[in-house]
Amino acid sequence: MAKHLFTSESVSEGHPDKIADQISDAVLDAILAQDPKARVACETYVKTGMVLVGGEVTTSAWVDIEELTRKTVREIGYVHSDMGFDADSCAVLNAIGKQSPDINQGVDRADPKEQGAGDQGLMFGYASNETDILMPAPITYAHALVKRQSEVRKDGTLPWLRPDAKSQVTFAYEDNKIVGIDAIVLSTQHSPDIAQADLIEGVMETIIKPVLPAQWLNKDTKYFINPTGRFVIGGPMGDCGLTGRKIIVDTYGGMARHGGGAFSGKDPSKVDRSAAYAARYVAKNIVAAGLADRCEIQVSYAIGVAEPTSISVETFGTGKVSEEVLIKLVRQHFDLRPYGLTEMLNLARPIYQATAAYGHFGRNEFPWEATDKADALRADAGL
């Protein structure tokens, strides 16, 4: 029997990089709500006492960047200088300019269907039947832990919690099947007046046990709860944060490859985002159709060109039909041109701020998680 361990991590909405992602996507959503055809590339930097919002935007919309930023930080929970960051007193600097006309001429077309890709690049999508949401288990449960931390912080169950937190889960596999959880790391920012023993008990009983399936925990499972012993200074005071620095947390926790392009702050004409969503949609439908147990899709683009420069499929030996057949089915059932995938997934609307914490995939409220093509794929594959 082949045994191996696999680890994925996640971070909470109060992590500095995630604050930046959420501000960038809040700006994107506010612009798309007024102007669905806007071109947006919004980057954010956060550090003690300040937020810098920059990037390139071409739009007819007007949004109050400062108020939007403060509202986002407030909703995350940084509302007092004791935390090292305060939504009402931090400085907000706006350095947004216009998109280069050189890019515009390569992307825009008289016929919208021939819209070119906003940049070159390669994107991956992945799905696996090891969970019911067709996502890898390690990242799924890493997200669930920090999501639970946020819930019990906000509802007052554990009032000493603060917004910044990180999780990490190591799963044990035999012959690529989960046999248990080997290790759990959960570090959470907290107020200075909570004793370490009380914190460990609260996290174990209120966050870890309700989230992780008991059948995967055993006497050998290792728990690391705030292993440094103290985590009072966190958020932007502890570390500066930048948009796009949590691309593995945002996707598959390292279980699949990544093309390198971040998502947050980018409108759907940016294939870094829209094609990665479409690739997840394709991979998930292939697995939902029973054509493979695991599936990774790669697509690539040239700037200003509508058709993908390549489409490839990898099923890791789990495919029920050949990968050549799968590629043919992908081309037949999915329009992966920039305009086509925006239309296919209805992406030109304000749905992005919710993606910017706890993962972009495995959450059924998003259109790229639908499995509406599975039956047709299965039928055309002859299964």
UniProtKB/Swiss-Prot annotation:
It is found in: Cytoplasm. Mg(2+) binds at D17. Its cofactor is Mg(2+); K(+). GO terms for cellular component: cytoplasm. It catalyses: L-methionine + ATP + H2O = S-adenosyl-L-methionine + phosphate + diphosphate. GO terms for molecular function: ATP binding; magnesium ion binding; methionine adenosyltransferase activity. Pathway: Amino-acid biosynthesis; S-adenosyl-L-methionine biosynthesis; S-adenosyl-L-methionine from L-methionine: step 1/1. It comes from the Bacteria. L-methionine binds at E56, Q99, D239, K270. CDD domains: S-AdoMet_synt (cd18079). Pfam families: S-AdoMet_synt_C, S-AdoMet_synt_M, S-AdoMet_synt_N. K(+) binds at E43. Gene3D superfamilies: 3.30.300.10. Keywords: ATP-binding, Cytoplasm, Magnesium, Metal-binding, Nucleotide-binding, One-carbon metabolism, Potassium, Transferase. ATP binds at H15, D164, A165, K166, R230, F231, D239, R245, K246, A262, K266. Binds 2 divalent ions per subunit. GO terms for biological process: one-carbon metabolic process; S-adenosylmethionine biosynthetic process. Its EC number is 2.5.1.6. Homotetramer; dimer of dimers. Belongs to the AdoMet synthase family. Catalyzes the formation of S-adenosylmethionine (AdoMet) from methionine and ATP. The overall synthetic reaction is composed of two sequential steps, AdoMet formation and the subsequent tripolyphosphate hydrolysis which occurs prior to release of AdoMet from the enzyme. This is S-adenosylmethionine synthase. It comes from Shewanella sp. (strain ANA-3). The lineage of its organism: Bacteria, Pseudomonadati, Pseudomonadota, Gammaproteobacteria, Alteromonadales.
